[in-house]
Amino acid sequence: MSVNLHYEDKARAAGFSAVCGVDEAGAGPLMGPVYAAAVILPEGCEIEGLNDSKKMTEKKREALFPVICEKAVAYAIASVDEKEIDATDILSARMKAMQLAIDALQIPADYALIDGNRDHGASAKITTPHEIIVGGDGASLSIAAASVLAKVSRDHYVVEVLDPMYPEYQFARHKGYGTKLHYQMLDQYGPSPVHRMTFLKKWEARR
């Protein structure tokens, strides 16, 4: 299925007026926050080249970021930091970040399209009326837009804030994912204050 407004149009036909797409980025890395974005696009919106952010090059994501912001009726970006991820769990952190993004929209959303197969964790859940769509970032235009905003925003935070704070870990190169280089830096320096300790079991087991 190509990325389109099928789900948005279906929700509007059911009587909802402000339909947002929601996605998150950074659930898998060993450090830093998880980010989420919510985007409301106008009816009939077209954004050439937009797809699931994971299927796009970094250059393409960067180019589309301002286009999405300009075309959106409303958008918002939120995050939950590594301390809260460790204190709760990554699923709850993802849900909290997504609901925070929805709540921060300049226009209140009355319906949300959520990427994934879950809408709640142990300590957080999506409270806005919604539907969950497996592979939504490759099907819904507004979810795809949210995936780009979340991914680019997190990458910028890692590169512009965390990498200068902890240059020895070379966060800008791997964005915190469990790459060979990242594990080598962990072996050499141990965890930083921004590492998710609950995510380091694999590293600890191989020491």
Model feature map: region roles:
Residues 1-207:
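RNase H-like, Mg2+-dependent phosphodiesterase core
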